């Protein structure tokens, strides 16, 4: 019988000045084989007066749901928008019997509605905005989407395959050849966003990616701009090659980031690494 077993689980959005959390779980998809998943969460305040990043990891009837949000700095109550978004995603995902691209799209809609409702209640329609990334994992697939410039990367067999494209001015300039992809993180307009939660939409602005078949030796990274701006894709790849679980991958990247940002004012920094492996046999033995 298919079942989901967590050795440890985190159900609610979490935040504080600095957190490291490691979890491991087993997702059955056949009687004699299963997917082993471990994930690691890191968040830190950096040199900012408060941490406006939020995350949620949820065990759901359909599988696992990860949400990561970065409240817009310089705007009022960005951390509230980020927490509302993560709460809305977690609550929606926990009520779903199955995951799909439609479920991801609906999760973004629920998050947008939650932020707009709070804006209206507090007469604060021009502020309170956030990015949001969502990853849903069931027994067969990864469903994922984003809005803003927080990123999701995924890799297979230790090789990076794809990342979400930022909804930013610099990503747009890169698409038309005016900025090199590798230079996005250094561009003066990198924080000018074109899509976020908390701005009224005429039509949904979140972008969903094609589902990815869930398989062993698969890795996923969700991260805010305070993380990816200080590590290149080449460095992420090197760290991945030198790792065999989510915690080591995260620690390898954080070590490089600490070297790269020594002369910079550190932004809030939050990331989730997910490591998926195949297993065989009876785990109850």
Regions found by a protein language model. Give the residues of each.
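PP2C/PPM-type serine/threonine phosphatase catalytic domain
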Residues: 3-285
């Amino acid at each position: 019988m298919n079942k989901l077993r967590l050795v440890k689980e985190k159900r609610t959005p979490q935040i504080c000045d600095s957190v490291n959390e490691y979890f491991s779980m087993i997702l059955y998809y056949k009687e004699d084989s299963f997917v082993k998943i471990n994930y690691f969460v890191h968040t830190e305040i950096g040199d900012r007066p408060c941490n406006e990043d939020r995350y949620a990891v949820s065990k759901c009837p359909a599988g696992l749901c990860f949400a990561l949000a970065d409240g817009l700095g310089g705007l009022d109550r960005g951390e509230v928008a980020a927490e509302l978004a993560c709460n809305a995603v977690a609550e929606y995902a926990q009520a779903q019997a199955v995951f799909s691209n439609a479920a991801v799209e609906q999760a973004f809609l629920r998050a947008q509605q939650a932020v707009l409702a709070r804006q209206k209640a507090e007469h604060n329609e021009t502020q309170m905005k956030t990015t949001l990334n969502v990853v849903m994992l069931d027994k067969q697939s990864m469903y994922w989407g984003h809005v803003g410039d927080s990123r999701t990367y995924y890799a297979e067999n230790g090789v990076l395959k794809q990342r979400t494209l930022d909804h930013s001015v610099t990503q747009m300039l890169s698409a038309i050849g005016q900025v090199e992809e590798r230079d996005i993180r250094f561009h003066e307009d990198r924080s000018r966003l074109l899509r976020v939660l908390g701005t009224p939409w005429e039509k949904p602005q979140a972008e969903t990616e094609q589902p990815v078949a869930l398989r062993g030796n698969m890795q996923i990274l969700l991260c805010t701009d305070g993380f990816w701006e200080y590590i290149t894709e080449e460095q992420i790849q090197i760290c991945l090659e030198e790792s065999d679980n989510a915690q080591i991958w995260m620690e390898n990247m954080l070590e490089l980031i600490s070297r790269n940002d020594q002369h910079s004012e550190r932004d809030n920094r939050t990331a989730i690494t997910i490591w998926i492996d195949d297993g065989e046999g009876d785990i109850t033995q």
